[in-house]
Design a protein with these regions (language model features):
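Catalytic core of pol beta-like nucleotidyltransferases
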Residues: 1-19, 25-31, 41-98
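Histidine-centered divalent-metal-coordination microenvironment in nucleic-acid enzymes
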Residues: 34
Length: 98
């Protein structure tokens, strides 16, 4: 988990928050469970290069360590606008800050 956090912070220095969510955060992961990472970027919108620069290095780290790392990117504003959704509520309830 620490390596995922270090990598995420290094490839997304503009991130306001980097959160682990899902089964790994809840502590009920199985051996084959993936790692779900939410990265909140302080930008006006998510661009294709953000996906390339943030999501791909984390996916590559997963390949190196034998884990499946899924990255979800939101702008800070878009995340706040979605605060009513079940996804947002679940992430905020279970998240671990990386």
């Amino acid at each position: 988990m620490q390596e995922i956090g270090r990598t995420a912070r290094s490839v997304a220095p503009m991130a306001k928050r980097i959160l682990l969510f899902g089964s790994q955060a809840r502590g009920d992961a199985r051996e084959d469970s993936d790692w779900d990472v939410l990265v909140l970027l302080d930008k006006d919108r998510i661009r294709l290069e953000d996906i390339d620069n943030v999501s791909y290095p984390l996916r590559e780290l997963g390949w190196e360590i034998g884990e499946d790392i899924n990255t979800v990117l939101y702008t800070v504003d878009d995340w706040a606008k979605n605060s009513f959704t079940p996804f947002h509520k679940n992430v905020e309830a279970e998240a671990i800050v990386l």
